[in-house]
Amino acid sequence: MRICVYCSSSAKIDKSYFEATEKLAKEFVKNNVWVVFGGGAIGLMGKLADTIIENKGKIKGIMPRFMNEVEWANKKVEDFELTDTMHERKVKFLQDIDGLVALPGGCGTMEELLEAITLKRLGQFTKPIVILNTNGYYEPLKQMLEKCVTEKFMHKKHLEIWSFVKEPEEVLEKIRTSKSWDPNAIEFAVNK
């Protein structure tokens, strides 16, 4: 199984986010999951990569050259790909994966996650999207997405695009049991 993980590059966040990331990384290694991530050495990206590498797991970093030039890259990650743009990076994140996991993060993580949700809504991405809601971090996003449906900005079927889980141990099971998504989802992307 190959999973893309979106997550924070901040080192100043509460330790509980690092602990949850470490647990998830160990679950990935235990289940022979190959992880694709943003390639960073700091914050949750660093914790994810370091834990996977320390436990002999598989991980690939993808980062734009301009970020690498300011030395944001995790030098411990051997499988590393540089891109020309942020857009190219996001395209590569979603290629040949079996699922997508979003850990808590800032505007970069949110932007990546919302783009994946949009692509799935349009049938351009069909894999499970699991959002790890550590400490209720994503509750406001969950409420906003639900409001999009209740206010009819999105179709009620779109509630099946994503899943929220509270614990790292729930992530892989949620990916395995997620309903398949219709590649013809564009037919109901517009709420007529």
Which residue stretches match the model-derived regions?
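Active-site/ligand-binding-proximal alpha/beta "capping" segment
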Residues: 88-122, 130, 180-189
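A cross-family phosphate/adenosyl-ligand binding-site feature
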Residues: 1-96, 135-169, 173, 180-192
